Amino acid sequence: KKLKNSSKKFTFFYPGNINQKTGGYIYENNILKFSKKNKFPIKFIELTSNYPNPNIQDIKNLNKLTSNIKSDNILIFDGLVLEGLDKSTDIFDNFKIIALIHHPLYLEFKGKKSEFFFKRAVKIYKKINYFIVTSLSTKKLLSKTFHINSNKISIVEPGIEKFKIYKKTLSTKVKILSCGSIIERKKYDYLIKEVQNIENIQLHLVGDVSRESKYTSKIKKIISKNNLKSKVILHGKISQVKLEKLYSNCDFYISTSEYEGFGMALANAALSKLPIISYKTETIQKTIGKDGVLYFDNHNKDTLKNLIINNCFDNKKYKILKKNIKNKKYLTNDQSAKLFMKAIHNA
């Protein structure tokens, strides 16, 4: 069905470069492309990648931008930007606000830092008129933990399109792929330590290195200190073609993250018939199911190492895993973007 072009106008704020190949950016870039193609009235504005920790100048810039927007516009904030606005909540008083939450940020951290972001979210979420989330578990979390009326929350799952398949280059090494911003929540330090003493393995990490520069430095240090440059390849930002070639050339996809908003990269792996090793979470189980997946449920020393050694070097086991991957149905990019437009229009 054709989407009615709305008389409402929207301004969408997101942080950093939208062309990066990690879940949240792919999701938002899809909305941007769809809205341009269909002349849907959303203006996209790129803010600094400093969010969710903006400096004074960043806030001044945002205030300047919003002061030039008519008050009948509806503002859409990416969660990373939103949770950096605890000292500028007056922005929320002048406009109707929609928040796109991939997951609340307090889940990315432990201890005091987690508590800090949790309190921030409690304060900010109260001011929001409507929420869009990417999975049922995030909707449940917002309802239960933040006491948000579930009528104010829409689920719009991401579009997952089949990647182009390239000819696989033969290799004596088992190649493992993991995609996602280089941030603490992804637990790349644990992943590297678990694979560093396994022979004949190569780990490919794809993702934005600018989000948590301290953590990126930590990862680079682990790699150089242990002479792992040829074993752990840090790709940073790459093109779609290179990403598709990596999916075609790797043997397994791995995720060590304790929390995912949806798990787009894992869904891509499932569609690419790539066996998956993943930390067990409710969301991931819903996104990719259990066929062709090896789950683990703790980040203890040697848990992952043993799982890899016992499963990834046995051709018979590999073939069974690959054969078991079911054809899961995901939304296409257009279906996802259309649902997003419908949700903001009805918000």
Regions found by a protein language model. Give the residues of each.
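Short hydrophobic beta-strand element within catalytic cores of glycosyltransferases
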Residues: 275-278
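Membrane-proximal helix-turn-helix segments that form the acceptor-binding/catalytic region
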Residues: 112-131
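Short alpha-helical donor nucleotide-sugar binding micro-motif in glycosyltransferases
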Residues: 237-238, 245-250
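Carbohydrate-associated surface elements
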Residues: 137, 159
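Aromatic "clamp/platform" in nucleotide-sugar-dependent glycosyltransferases that forms part
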Residues: 258
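Conserved acidic donor-binding segment of nucleotide-sugar-dependent glycosyltransferases
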Residues: 290-302, 310-316
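Nucleotide-activated donor-binding/catalytic signature segment of Leloir-type glycosyltransferases, i.e.
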Residues: 216-238
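Conserved donor-binding/catalytic core segment of Leloir-type glycosyltransferases
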Residues: 132, 169-186, 192-198, 203-206
